[in-house]
Amino acid sequence: MNKFILIPLVTLNILFGSAAFSQKPVASFQDWGVYSSNDPKLCWLASTAMKVENTRGGKPAMNVTRGDIVLFITYLPEKDILGEVSFGGGYPFKPNQMVELQIGSAKYDLIPEGGFAWPANSDIDTKIRVSMTRGSTATIKAESTRGTKTKDTFSLRGFTAALKDTKKRCGV
């Protein structure tokens, strides 16, 4: 398995496997929540989509079932994960088709694996985080294994403050 897939899967296993994701935020900054857990030390900020659009054949799709739609930034210092960007779309993504993240005029490809997607490397993570501190919204476009096209929009209000708080909590 590729390193760019293995590390995010380890992170998500910790987040979801430990029920850490279901906990309440330790801090909130407008549209972003900050979370942390110990053993191992794990800190992340997350936001849910403020607008969700689902289409099939170019028309609005009404009967679409999706799980949680979340944009994350994760810090797991023990595994040298320092600001990893990830997106949970609430459904399995179409294999071998990039997920597109747009912040302002900047566009980034995210690599899908099951129902999650990540940038290919930490350099792209850094570029995305910088764009997020400067932008007002982040829009993610993807397609499900069933052919449903989705467009999820996230507010970036409070992102910069939440990012600073998360890094402080994780000592990075």
Predicted regions and their residues:
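Bacterial N-terminal signal peptides
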Residues: 7-16
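Positively charged n-region of N-terminal signal peptides that target proteins for export
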Residues: 1-4
